[in-house]
Every structure is written in structure tokens, then in C-alpha cells.
Amino acid sequence: MKILEVNCGSSSLKYQLIDMEDEKVLAKGLVERIGIDGSILTHKVNGEKHVVSEPIKDHRVAVKLVLEALVDKQHGVIKDMSEISAVGHRVVHGGEQYSDAVIIDDKVMESLKDCSKLAPLHNPPNIIGINACKAIMPNTPMVAVFDTAFHHTMPKYAYIYPLPYELYERYGIRKYGFHGTSHRFVSEEAARLMGKDISELKIITCHLGNGASICAVDRGKSIDTNMGFTPLAGLAMGTRCGDIDPAIIPFLTNEIGMSIDEISNIMNNKSGILGMSGISSDFRDVEEIASFKHDRRAQLALDVFYYRVKSFIGSYVAVLDGVDAIVFTAGVGENSSIGRAEICSGLTYLGITIDEEKNNIRGKATEITTANSKTKVFVIPTNEELVIARDTKFLVQKKISHKSK
């Protein structure tokens, strides 16, 4: 069974074709600048790159180009589209309705549109991608896999905000959490590396990238996470502020005369590492300037980031009543050995001892603590695409088995 995994942004489309017999990636690629000048498809097979530069006016054209690349005589990996058994779509927000992946039908599409008000930047492009695939592959099953689904196991006291309860009942204002597919994958991988069943373990997963969140995983289930109603909450991120005093918003409105749109733009696009450093949202740039140029604001931005991560880890140790393992993943979590060392240096009360040599290993799942470390620390490259493909395969096979009965 071959599964096409698709992740649509407002002007981009990432994809992987995975053979589920051995979970091998046959091809992967990225369509950029959809509907914008300079559109480009980068298609990769066995490390070789094939680039198509031509106008791509919308996502339907992008999907068509991807499928043409997959069946191309020179760069393709399948004979025709019938070899694609199903398409798995990443969908950011499933609201309260979806606690698991689901086969997409008309009812599901209506629900996804309803959820768009909760994720106006993310769900609409996801829906556009689904519609584009359905138009070109009308007989191929489509599956939605939700970023929010893993966090459906949070207890109510963890996700309810201390606001009038009617706001939750009428408008769904509550903590939802995001990056769930990533937190799920790396927590399961950590259990595998430890040689233990995940049902025996308490794990804190740190998805640290341009967007960042931390999750408390108790015996395989998310019981708390620090992103909230939107992905703006929690840690300081690349351009997002994370948790701040909500009274700052009316202050900026009343004292400075900023509009809500202006404030939203500042909090989402001009804050975080970029806002504090005044240099870049890219952690690598800020680390380099802090290290080699001794830039104080760059160092301050890093210190705030490290502090917030340590603070949430400490909070989740309390929530879990102990911890067996901490996992770092995503761009910063996987690649910043300095960042991991700084964060873990404040966690000595957990009996963590970092092995400096192991901490410098990149590109593979690795334990970076010494043999006598009481709490294990892992660096695990995330693989959300594989989780989406696995969930898609499971649902399609389940549907086939029901039909055969």
C-alpha cells in the first residue's frame, strides 16, 4: 500500500509518497509560491532533485504537478495514480469533535470549515489542499489527521480557562494544544529506545522549532501542553510571543492607539526570538551572533527561551508527579546542542547528566545522557509524515475489512 501524505500551507504544498510495506519514502517534495510569481516544485527521489519552475496558479495545479512528477518516466516512482491507495492530509485543528484521524466525507468537510474560525491561518489552506486532491483523485480515499487530536486526553481542569464558562460553551474557548502528531511520535519512539512499554512511562516532549510547544505525556496520553486556544500561547517562539499578561493588549489599545489587527500582527509575526533580539527569528543566526559577537540582546533572547523551556519542564514534572524521560525534537530541539545543554543544566535536580559527545550527534535518534543519569534525555527527529501515513493506512484497511464482512 502506497500513501501520499500532503501538508498544505497558504502558498505551499509539502508531500511524501510512502510505501507502507516497509515505510520507505519513495519520493518527497515541496511546491512553493503557489499563486505567486516564481512558483517552483522541488521533487526528490533517492536524494536526486528535480525542479519544475512554471506558473502554479492554485493548489489544484500544484497537486496536478505533484502527481505528474510521481508518474514521470524519468523522475517518477509509480506507473500511474491507481498505485496511490489513499491520501493523508495534515489538518491543524479538529476542534472538540475529532480525537482521532477520520476518513473525509461531506460531513467532515463541513466540520473542518466550522473549525476554521478556531484556526483561520491554518485550516483554510488545509481544506483547499483536500479539495484540490479530491478534484483530481475523486475515487481515492482521503484521510484527515489532526494536530489537536493527541491532546484530547487532557483532563477538563487542564484545558478550561478561568473565564466565564459560557465562553467555552458558546464559542469553544479552551486550550486545544498543537503539534500533537509530533509529540505522539517522539514519545512513542522514546519508549521504544528505552525498551519499555509507553504505558509504563512519564515523558516530557519538547517540540522546539520556529513554532514550539511542550507536552506532558502520562503513559502514552497527553495530559497537558502549553499551546492553548491558538498556537500563540506557551513558549517564546521564532516570531510569536508565547505567554504574556493579557492586560498588555488593552494597554496597547488605550495608551498607544494600536488596533487589534496591529497587536495580533506584533504578537504573531514580530515578537519572540525576532522581537527580543532585533536580529532574526532563526535560532541559528541568533546563537551565532550571541556566541561570536557577544551581542547582549541576542543572548537575552536565548536566555528567555531557555528559561521558559526549563520553567514548563519543571511545571510538567509536577503535573506528572515525576518524569522518566525528556525528549527534544524539531529544528531547534534536534540541532541546537548548546540549547539542549543550557536547558538541561537547570534540571540537575532530576538527576540529569549530559554526555557532551552524544549531545553533539545529529540526524538520528540518540540518548544524550550518561549511563548513570536518573532521568533519560533523548534527541529524536520528528516524523509527522509517517504518523499521518500510518493513521491513513489503518483507517483505509479498517474500511476495506468492514466492506468485506
Curated annotation (Swiss-Prot):
UniProt-recorded Gene Ontology molecular function terms: acetate kinase activity; ATP binding; magnesium ion binding
Residues noted as binding substrate in the record, renumbered to the chain: 90
UniProt catalytic activity: acetate + ATP = acetyl phosphate + ADP
Major location category of this protein: cytoplasm
Cofactor: Mg(2+); Mn(2+)
Pathway stated in the Swiss-Prot or TrEMBL entry: Metabolic intermediate biosynthesis; acetyl-CoA biosynthesis; acetyl-CoA from acetate: step 1/2
Cellular component GO terms, alphabetical: cytoplasm
Gene3D superfamilies per the UniProt record, alphabetical: 3.30.420.40
Keyword Magnesium part of the UniProt annotation: yes
EC supergroup of this enzyme: transferase
Subcellular location field: Cytoplasm
GO biological process: acetate metabolic process; acetyl-CoA biosynthetic process
Protein's UniProt keywords contain Nucleotide-binding: yes
Active site: 147
Site (Transition state stabilizer): 179, 240
Cofactor note: Mg(2+). Can also accept Mn(2+).
Residue numbers binding Mg(2+): 7, 384
Pfam family, one: Acetate_kinase
Binding residues annotated for ATP, in chain numbering: 14, 207-211, 282-284, 331-335
Family membership noted in the UniProt record: Belongs to the acetokinase family.
Subunit structure: Homodimer.
Function as written in the Swiss-Prot or TrEMBL entry: Catalyzes the formation of acetyl phosphate from acetate and ATP. Can also catalyze the reverse reaction.
Name of this chain's protein: Acetate kinase
Gene behind this protein: ackA
